[in-house]
Amino acid sequence: MEPINDSYTVVSRKPSLTPSGWFGNSKDMIVELENFMTPEEVEFLEKAAKSLTIWDVTQSHVNENGTVVYDSDYWKDRVASNPSLDKNDPAISPVIAGLFQRLKPIVEEFYKVEVVPTGTTIVKWMPGQFQKPHADNELHEGPDAGTPNDFPHYNISRLFYLNDDYEGGELYFPLQGVQFKPKKGAAYFFPGDRNFIHGVTEIKSGLRFTCPFFWEITKHTGERQP
């Protein structure tokens, strides 16, 4: 990595071993597991999320072409990954990690892969915030379309939803024509490439809390190989 000023760092990322578009573009690749979390897990994590006071401090990144691949200002004071979670309450991360392990065999069987998860994270969404359609592991438009973003190993995206006492904040997939308000306690997963760009509609009121994390594919186990 090469610093270019006080605000941005140039980064170069290696592509994933899984080609973009490997999983096609069917809406059937977007999976909902309703009531995946137990009532006790939901209650604990919702309360923990609403009590967070320590958030990550990060730096924005650009690629070799000067395109922003991670904007730290957008996420300021609303993302708590593992180190920040531990400073808030060391009991939080083990509960989320337990969800990872329970979901792992389901994801591996569905996509015919072996995966490892990224770290534990809770994200807060406040009124007025939204997210434009994006892919999780690559850039999807302009001259950099198809090149890695800051997270090329985010092959499969996964979200746990911790609350539903807010308005707006729907998850949508414009290429598949899918839009819905995620259900409290549910798990969702889908491919991270540009065939599954997705966004979040504006939060109108209340606070929206999610546990996003991602799976890196380390091996393809099906007959079809990249």
Label the predicted regions:
Residues 51, 127-128, 161-165, 193-194:
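Glycine-rich, acidic and aromatic/proline-enriched surface loops and short helix-turn segments
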Residues 154-160:
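Short, well-structured beta-strand
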Residues 33-36, 89-100, 106-113, 121, ...:
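Preference for well-ordered, secondary-structure-rich cores of eukaryotic proteins
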Residues 123-151:
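Conserved short histidine dyad/triad with adjacent acidic residue
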Residues 37, 49, 137, 162, ...:
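Short beta-strand segments enriched in hydrophobic/aromatic residues
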Residues 2-110, 121:
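Non-heme Fe(II)/2-oxoglutarate
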Residues 144-146, 150, 154, 165-226:
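Catalytic core of Fe(II)/2-oxoglutarate
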